[in-house]
Design a protein with these regions (language model features):
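Active-site gating loops and adjacent loop-to-helix segments of metal-dependent hydrolytic enzymes
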Residues: 2-48, 99-120
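Divalent metal-dependent hydrolysis catalytic cores, especially in the metallo-beta-lactamase
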Residues: 38-44, 58-79, 93-105, 140-150, ...
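Conserved, mostly hydrophobic/aromatic
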Residues: 1, 69, 169
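Active-site-adjacent C-terminal substructures of enzyme catalytic domains
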Residues: 211-257
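Distinct, well-ordered alpha-helical segments
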Residues: 82-84, 110, 155-160, 184-204, ...
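Active-site gating/metal-coordination segments in enzymes
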Residues: 86-90, 94-175, 228, 243-244
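Active-site beta-loop-alpha junctions enriched in small/polar residues
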Residues: 3-5, 74-75, 100-104, 147-150, ...
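Glycine-enriched alpha-helix->loop->beta-strand junction motifs that scaffold or abut catalytic
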Residues: 92, 172-175, 198-204, 233-240
Length: 257
């Protein structure tokens, strides 16, 4: 999984008011020291917007044996479907595009007013009918859902998007990738990840995609995660650190860690 193009402007902290004004400056050695201290001070330093650079990296990737790349960039963070098509043709690397929404800071303003069903329908359209960036040359369809972003303190719309993503995954059979926040601390991290997995499991139960909600030793954090993982396996999903997919075949699960 990788980002070939990415515009994280909406995720960056507010521009500093004090000099030096390096946020919009060209990426040169003059600002190297400042960027070592804080890489996110400069927009060019965090943008991935060069098709030429992406092509060079894909050529090196293929030379090393790579044949398939999953691009987890969503539309609001700079997804570029037409450029992905050009790169796939130029490098002979198969590129699979994702769909959905990342964390709330990157959401388009209209998303807050959308229902879970309508958000799921948007994802389904991109998987089955093609992305809005499609053109006369052909439909540009997503091949998986994600990466779906969930903040350390999850926003209500993020949780709605997560439930919608599960709904679309169950409807279409598409793999689902969730990108969790970096949460430090054993108990805090356990509760955070447990909450994400619980939402996924609950939504699959609601949709009739899960046959049983029990299982697992809940005396420890690892046991609790193991229990939820087994539930998802019973539903036909294999959950790893960054995503959920349908295993082939579906084998018995084992705990994380």
């Amino acid at each position: 999984m990788q980002h070939l193009f990415r515009d994280p402007s909406s995720l960056l902290p507010p521009a500093p008011s004090a000099p030096p004004p390096i946020r919009a400056a060209a990426l040169t050695l003059d600002i190297r020291g400042a960027l070592i201290e804080d890489p996110e001070q400069n927009l060019e330093n965090v943008h991935l917007n060069s098709e030429k650079a992406a092509e060079a990296e894909l050529i090196a990737f293929r030379a090393a044996g790579g044949r398939l790349l999953l691009d987890t960039t969503v539309a609001s963070l700079g997804r570029n479907p037409r450029a992905l098509r050009r790169l796939a043709r130029a490098t002979n690397v198969s590129i699979v595009m994702g769909c959905g929404f990342s964390v709330a800071a990157s959401h388009p303003s209209w998303l807050a007013g959308e229902s879970q069903d309508s958000i799921a329908a948007m994802m389904q359209r991109e998987l089955e009918g093609g992305a809005i960036e499609s053109d006369d040359e052909g439909r540009l369809r997503a091949g998986f859902i994600g990466a779906i972003g969930v903040s350390a303190a999850p926003h209500e719309v993020e949780l709605r998007v997560l439930r919608a993503a599960v709904q679309a995954a169950v409807k279409t059979g598409a793999p689902l990738f969730v990108e969790p926040a970096y949460v430090l601390g054993g108990e805090q991290a356990r509760l955070y990840l447990n909450g994400i997995l619980d939402i996924i499991g609950q939504e699959m139960l609601r949709l009739g995609a899960c046959a049983h909600a029990g299982g697992g030793d809940h005396e420890s954090g690892r046991g609790q995660l193991k229990g939820i993982r087994l539930v998802l396996l019973r539903c036909g999903y294999l959950c790893e650190v960054r995503g959920c997919r349908r295993p082939t075949p579906c084998t018995a699960g084992h705990g994380w860690g």
